[in-house]
Amino acid sequence: MAIAIGLDFGSDSVRALAVDCATGEEIATCVEWYPRWQEGCYCDAPNNQFRHHPRDYIESMEAALKNVLTTLSASQRGEVVGIGVDSTGSTPAPIDVDGHVLALRPEFAENPNAMFVLWKDHTSVEEAEAITRLCHTPGKTDYSRYIGGIYSSEWFWAKILHVTRQDSAVAQAAASWIELCDWVPALLSGTTRPQDIRRGRCSAGHKSLWHESWGGLPPASFFDDLDPIINRHLAWPLFTDTFTADLPVGTLCAEWAQRLGLPESVVISGGAFDCHMGAVGAGAQPNALVKVIGTSTCDILIADKQSVGDRAVKGICGQVDGSVVPDFIGLEAGQSAFGDIYAWFGRILGWPLEQLAAQHPELKDQIAISQKQLLPTLTEAWAKNPSLDHLPVVLDWFNGRRTPNANQRLKGVISDLNLATDAPALFGGLIAATAFGARAIQECFTEQGIAVNNVMALGGIARKNQVIMQACCDVLNRPLQIVASDQCCALGAAIFAAVAAKAHVDIPAAQQKMASAVENTLQPRPEQAQRFEQLYQRYRQWAVSAEQHYLPTATPAPKTPVSQATLTH
């Protein structure tokens, strides 16, 4: 038996999963929460700042791995052949000449700018817009061509530029920047020095403007035109070569071998983003749209190179050769908020209960139980009486919009309220909004000639809330496959580890043995689908109209209204 371990670094926690490479059996798993993040450290939500301390990653990873390894028998621990890594992204951090994340140094230990800038940190909206404008300068190369045409504040260079402008001490100490999904494999293999790091194709292609057609990263002149401060502090190019995640970055270094009780022969595979590896763990085949659903969504589709050709798909988060499966084009999209929208509504409704608990401590336990039941009760109530004829129309931009056409200035909108709108109806409007966002992504692909043969959903919401998934199915008006595994991203990371360790010859072969099954296929309900179609058209009308209110101040609104934005009441 050969065993591979997948590490999945999420927004709140890290998961370790041990998998039998021959059968795909999930042998042992452990989730460890980030302690500082749980306390809200280094974050400023009103200003869209979300940072992770590297010690959160190190401590939680070590605890999760040790827990999993303790669960294995002595003989099984001897059969661990590889460790694979996925993470959120773009989640970069500044490192010094020795490869240490700056926040690991005493003088930067409490400086959020010296930490990992989490994917959902939107402090760099202006920098992202500047990158987009520069890419679209007439007569110059459009380096946004293969990342959907718009650069996002959730991505690598925007975050680097923002921190570099804001914090001169960090800018001077940073020898380079590294994505979380590249840093963890480098840490485990002892290859963290900037010149030793093997940069992943996934993160470089989707978030860093890296592409083969212009020889890697944009030229130094591009960054001079953007802001000379980048080249003043960072050596160009930051990196040149990139590697697919099925290739090893090295083996377990002596320090981590000793800490974990594993041999130094354990192979460390290349890193990639969580949802890309999640699609592999789900067993996705070409032209399957895989929705990884959690606090937000990431939507992944792979297509063969011939079918994509030289087409540049607009409005998405990139198309990258080998970002998901080697020798296929990986296309990424996503919604900036999904589960987070439901959680927001739960907090709104729960606020009076929190005040009541503070005033009456004897009721605290009972109120806490009631708070946990808020969303399940709302879901059940709306499912019994969907009331689509009186459903509020909601725009799902509560955390901006990722796809189509990234724009983090956008805000959520709730419309069509009246005095009869009750809590279940409003919650139903939020459910419909997240489903409409999913359909907008599907259409972003199909309207540009990228076929979507089937749709798959994975993650906790996908498996545990059939009401929400059925709404998505009805809105998409096509079957929706629910993937069985609760931990597809970690499973995908384990699959890449198995290939890097030569337990399988390639990713498709490993998927046949190790990928998750589909546990359920939902079918659209014709009557509901027809009513949702009408609501979706209103969603599109509101989207076009509302977007004009969130344009940058320097951008005038169109003088003539877009015809499809005409609202009828």
Curated annotation (Swiss-Prot):
GO terms for cellular component: cytoplasm. GO terms for biological process: L-arabinose catabolic process to xylulose 5-phosphate. Pathway: Carbohydrate degradation; L-arabinose degradation via L-ribulose; D-xylulose 5-phosphate from L-arabinose (bacterial route): step 2/3. It comes from the Bacteria. CDD domains: ASKHA_NBD_FGGY_L-RBK (cd07781). It catalyses: D-ribulose + ATP = D-ribulose 5-phosphate + ADP + H(+); L-ribulose + ATP = L-ribulose 5-phosphate + ADP + H(+). Keywords: Arabinose catabolism, ATP-binding, Carbohydrate metabolism, Kinase, Nucleotide-binding, Transferase. It is an enzyme of class 2 (transferase). Gene3D superfamilies: 1.20.58.2240, 3.30.420.40. Its EC number is 2.7.1.16. GO terms for molecular function: ATP binding; D-ribulokinase activity; ribulokinase activity. Belongs to the ribulokinase family. This is Ribulokinase. The lineage of its organism: Bacteria, Pseudomonadati, Pseudomonadota, Gammaproteobacteria, Enterobacterales.
